[in-house]
């Protein structure tokens, strides 16, 4: 698996009246210098009194924040996999998923807070709907507002042009212009969708046994859309289930890299997804226009990031 060190642990045991049976759930978290956020995430899981037991696996990307010692001391039930370098998100998440023993596998970001009952609600909903292969909760921002990216359609040309030009915000009730983030749909409605956010996503084990794990061509973005797409192609359904809720603080996760690489990988992931799943649906001129759009947006994003750094340049933290 490419891991350097592992802590052998037992499962987390907590009693509850209507909990999840033992060995049914594995939660996999990738972290990179995010120990403060991870502690909050783990505490929110531990405080979720509707769980009887679960397996928690933390995969570290070469952090320098003492995370291994912290977990060994304060969270001895957590299984730890340590990498020497920052491998992004997809590869280390696969390390965790391939180690996991649970019937259900959950991808979870370290900068999240599980709200009461969320995990149990997701599992009960999937238990009652065996056709669902992947399910995700309602994701909230730190201020309690809805995080629109938690449920999405595929990044098709018109949807993405509308998204990039912010037409979806101007015409949120339009299925044509508001399609990528499904802005015309009720945020409190259970909904079959094309894709969910990897910040919190519950996957049935049979899905990865059938279609494989995350595609490691994706460094850190659109890997969630890709696995959802492959699941749908295999006949599984993907559902957004807002009865379960989490908070995602954002930007403090496990794959943080230099800003320019992050920008490049973000745009590359859209190009890769389009080439892999959508290009055959369109005439080649449409495809080249889409690729050109991505290049133009990439150049603009790099320039904007450079100008922001110049504008806000100041003393660095020592």
Describe every region a protein language model picked out:
Residues 44, 60-68, 85:
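A conserved acidic beta->alpha catalytic loop
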Residues 43-53:
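Short, acidic, metal-binding catalytic loop of nucleotide-sugar glycosyltransferases
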Residues 83-100, 121:
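Glycine-rich, basic loop-to-helix element that forms the pyrophosphate-binding segment
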Residues 115-149:
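Conserved donor NDP-sugar-binding/catalytic core segment of glycosyltransferases
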Residues 186-245:
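A short, conserved alpha-helix in the catalytic core of glycosyltransferases
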């Amino acid at each position: 698996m490419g891991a350097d060190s592992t802590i052998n642990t037992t499962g987390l045991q907590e009693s509850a009246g209507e909990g999840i049976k033992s060995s049914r759930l594995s939660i996999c978290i990738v972290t990179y210098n995010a120990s403060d956020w991870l502690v909050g995430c783990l505490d929110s899981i531990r405080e979720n009194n509707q769980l009887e037991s679960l397996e928690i696996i933390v995969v570290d990307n070469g952090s320098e924040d003492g995370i291994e010692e912290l977990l060994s001391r304060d969270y001895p039930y957590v299984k730890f996999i340590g990498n020497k370098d920052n491998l992004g998100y997809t590869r280390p998440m696969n390390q965790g998923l391939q180690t996991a023993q649970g019937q259900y596998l959950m991808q979870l970001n370290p900068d999240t807070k599980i709200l009461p009952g969320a995990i149990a609600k997701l599992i009960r909903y999937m238990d009652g709907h065996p056709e669902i292969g992947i399910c995700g909760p309602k994701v909230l921002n730190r201020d309690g507002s809805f995080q629109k990216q938690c449920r999405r359609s595929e990044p098709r040309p018109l949807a993405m042009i509308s998204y990039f030009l912010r037409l979806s915000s101007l015409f949120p009730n339009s299925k044509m212009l508001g399609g990528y983030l499904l802005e015309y749909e009720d945020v409190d409605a259970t909904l079959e969708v094309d894709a969910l956010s990897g910040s919190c996503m519950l996957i049935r084990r049979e899905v990865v046994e059938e279609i494989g794990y995350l595609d490691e061509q994706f460094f850190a973005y659109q890997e969630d859309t890709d696995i959802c797409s492959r699941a749908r192609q295999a006949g599984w359904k993907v559902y957004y289930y807002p009865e379960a809720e989490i908070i995602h603080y954002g930007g403090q996760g496990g794959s943080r890299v230099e800003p320019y690489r992050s920008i490049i990988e973000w745009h590359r992931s859209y190009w890769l997804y389009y080439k892999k799943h959508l290009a055959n649906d369109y005439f080649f001129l449409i495809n080249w226009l889409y690729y050109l759009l991505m290049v133009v947006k990439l150049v603009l994003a790099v320039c904007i990031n450079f100008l922001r750094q110049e504008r806000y340049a100041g003393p660095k933290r020592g």
